[in-house]
Amino acid sequence: MQINKLYDDVYEIKDFLSKEEFDAVNYIINNTPEKDWFDEESKKKNNIPDFWYGKYLHFETENIFTTINTKMKNLFDSYSYYPDKLSLSRYKKGDFITQHTDQWIPDLPYYIGYGFCLYYNDNYEGGELEYPDLNITVKPKANTLYIHGGHILHGSLPVLDDRIRYFSTVFIHGTDESPTILNKELFK
């Protein structure tokens, strides 16, 4: 695992997953039927917004994404809440997410300390990750985790071809009593 600091509160971790973990994710990507991406029951149960319908795969049972989620959680010394499930997301041709910060809901009893985005493939055109206020635009490589502070403006550019971009995101919460603090040994 190689950690690169791109800017204050923006990190890139190459080769985040082991070969076995990476292969297990790709097995799910390559063997999930298209109909599973459009599960109405899961949409209702997990409050999946229309924007994410067909782009979001939620798992009810433990699998490789449980292992990955634990690995991500271990990058912290402190936090108030860390989600117990990790999902698989995808963007098809034309899909993107507009520039935003992860701390977008006012008056919450917590803040989003960090957002994580782990990329599983890089064989698509477009789909770059951008941090416009920092003048950073990157084409994420497969098996690379990006970490950014919840206050940092970011977004993605549209996927330009018919190859699908696969990734997982997670948001880590903090409070005044339990702030989000990255592992001091890893993030020096």
Tell what function each PLM region has.
Residues 90-91, 107-125, 171-172:
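Short, conserved beta-strand element in jelly-roll/cupin
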Residues 112, 125-188:
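Catalytic core of Fe(II)/2-oxoglutarate
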Residues 17, 29, 103, 120, ...:
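Short beta-strand segments enriched in hydrophobic/aromatic residues
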Residues 1-80, 87:
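Non-heme Fe(II)/2-oxoglutarate
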Residues 96-104:
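Histidine-centered catalytic micro-motifs
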Residues 81-95:
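A short glycine-rich, His/Asp/Glu-containing loop-to-beta-strand
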